[in-house]
UniProtKB/Swiss-Prot annotation:
Keywords: Activator, Chromatin regulator, Cytoplasm, mRNA transport, Nucleus, Protein transport, Transcription, Transcription regulation, Translocation, Transport. GO terms for cellular component: DUBm complex; nuclear pore; nucleoplasm; P-body; SAGA complex; transcription export complex 2. Component of the nuclear pore complex (NPC)-associated TREX-2 complex (transcription and export complex 2), composed of at least SUS1, SAC3, THP1, SEM1, and CDC31. TREX-2 contains 2 SUS1 chains. The TREX-2 complex interacts with the nucleoporin NUP1. Component of the 1.8 MDa SAGA transcription coactivator-HAT complex. SAGA is built of 5 distinct domains with specialized functions. Within the SAGA complex, SUS1, SGF11, SGF73 and UBP8 form an additional subcomplex of SAGA called the DUB module (deubiquitination module). Interacts directly with THP1, SAC3, SGF11, and with the RNA polymerase II. The keyword Transcription applies. The keyword Transcription regulation applies. This is Transcription and mRNA export factor SUS1. It is found in: Nucleus, Nucleoplasm; Cytoplasm, P-body. Its main location: nucleus. InterPro entries: TF_ENY2, TF_EnY2_sf. It comes from Cryptococcus neoformans var. neoformans serotype D (strain JEC21 / ATCC MYA-565). GO terms for biological process: chromatin organization; poly(A)+ mRNA export from nucleus; protein transport; regulation of transcription by RNA polymerase II; transcription elongation by RNA polymerase II. GO terms for molecular function: chromatin binding; transcription coactivator activity. Involved in mRNA export coupled transcription activation by association with both the TREX-2 and the SAGA complexes. At the promoters, SAGA is required for recruitment of the basal transcription machinery. It influences RNA polymerase II transcriptional activity through different activities such as TBP interaction and promoter selectivity, interaction with transcription activators, and chromatin modification through histone acetylation and deubiquitination.
């Protein structure tokens, strides 16, 4: 997997997203991500963290809870999950570039 820093304009990103929606790749990758997050225990870990943070609040505040959880959520995703999903995205992009 090669990582190249490339600045991509918003129009290009929107065009890629639209193409992925049209081909069904967007939904397929979302399902893959959800499955990996479930299998890795991330979903349960996130629920546990949310319960812990909610119990620690003096005054229940959903907005603050969501902010706290959101700050931790991405960092809790395993490297294997990130790698697998990135490989799939790269595969889709490579295929689309080859077809263009």
């Amino acid at each position: 997997m090669s990582h190249v820093d490339v600045t991509v304009d918003e129009a290009t990103i929107n065009a890629i997203r639209q193409r992925m929606l049209e081909t069904g790749d967007w939904e397929r990758i979302q399902k893959l991500l959800r499955a990996h997050l479930e299998e890795s225990g991330w979903v349960d870990d996130l629920k546990d963290l949310a319960k812990e943070k909610a119990r620690a609040q003096d005054v229940p505040n959903l907005e603050n809870l969501v902010k706290q959880i959101s700050e931790s959520a991405a960092g809790m995703v395993s490297d294997n999950v990130k790698r697998d999903v990135m490989l799939e995205i790269e595969s889709v992009l490579d295929r689309e570039v080859d077809q263009a």
